[in-house]
UniProtKB/Swiss-Prot annotation:
Organism: Bradyrhizobium diazoefficiens (strain JCM 10833 / BCRC 13528 / IAM 13628 / NBRC 14792 / USDA 110)
Binding residue positions for ATP: 35-42
EC number: 7.6.2.5
Topology in the lipid bilayer: Peripheral membrane protein
Pfam families tied to this protein: ABC_tran (PF00005)
Known role: Part of the ABC transporter complex CcmAB involved in the biogenesis of c-type cytochromes; once thought to export heme, this seems not to be the case, but its exact role is uncertain. Responsible for energy coupling to the transport system.
Gene Ontology biological process terms, A to Z: cytochrome complex assembly
Subunit structure: The complex is composed of two ATP-binding proteins (CcmA) and two transmembrane proteins (CcmB).
Record's subcellular location: Cell inner membrane
ABC transporter domain residues: 3-199
Protein name as annotated: Cytochrome c biogenesis ATP-binding export protein CcmA
Reaction catalysed by this enzyme: heme b(in) + ATP + H2O = heme b(out) + ADP + phosphate + H(+)
GO MF entries: ABC-type heme transporter activity; ATP binding; ATP hydrolysis activity
PANTHER family per the UniProt record, alphabetical: ABC TRANSPORTER I FAMILY MEMBER 1 (PTHR43499:SF1)
Length: 200
């Protein structure tokens, strides 16, 4: 599987964010997108996820599931946790599994993996920032998708949480998955750098 972009142009609010961007990533590879604030790191992830439309150029997936669109093969995890505060941990995860569709895996096992199996009944409003991030990460495990698009994925995670997530990413890559992450911090796994907008 290979994800590639050729001469990609991103325009937001009438402003050109970047132009002529080329990139590629293959199965088993992690790419860390780096650059200054406002250089377009998040915009690139949103373009790949189908949440924005390129103003020019192409983004294509070769070797994925031919019956699914590129966005349908992507997990997009934004820098905000996208949780409903009044819903419990289990209910939030169930909501996302229903919304995403596709092959659904064991939710309790996903919560156990991220260290939240003891808190399934708690409303998300009662979780710490680190716990909310762990719950967001559990989405990646509950519905199987080969491409993970991650925006500042380790935000609010303590050292133990970062180590846990590093293990999840390595497992995903070992199964032939692909990761593109916009980050200001080291991912904690082997990755190739894609720099946007000159020196960060």
């Amino acid at each position: 599987m290979q994800l590639s972009g050729r001469r990609v142009i991103c325009v937001r609010g009438g402003r050109e964010v970047f132009a002529g961007l080329d990139f590629e990533a293959v199965s088993g590879e992690a790419v860390a997108v780096v650059g200054r604030n406002g250089s377009g790191k998040t915009s690139l992830l949103r373009l790949i996820a189908g949440l924005l439309i390129p103003a020019g150029g192409t983004i294509a997936l070769d070797g994925g599931d031919a019956e699914l669109t590129l966005p349908e093969q992507c997990h997009y995890l934004g820098h905000r946790d996208a949780l409903k505060p009044a819903l419990s941990v289990a209910e939030n995860l169930s909501f996302w599994a229903d919304f995403l569709g596709g092959e659904r895996l064991d939710a309790h096992e996903s919560l156990a993996t991220v260290g939240l199996d003891h808190a399934t009944h708690l409303p998300a409003a009662f979780l710490s920032a680190g716990q909310r991030r762990r719950l967001s990460l559990a989405r990646l495990l509950t519905v199987r998708r080969p491409i993970w698009l991650l925006d500042e994925p380790t935000t609010a995670l303590d050292v133990a949480g970062q180590d846990m997530f590093g293990g999840l990413m390595r497992d995903h890559l070992a199964r032939g998955g692909l990761i593109i992450a916009a980050t200001h911090m080291a991912l904690g796994i082997d990755s190739r750098e894609l720099r946007i907008g000159g020196v960060a």
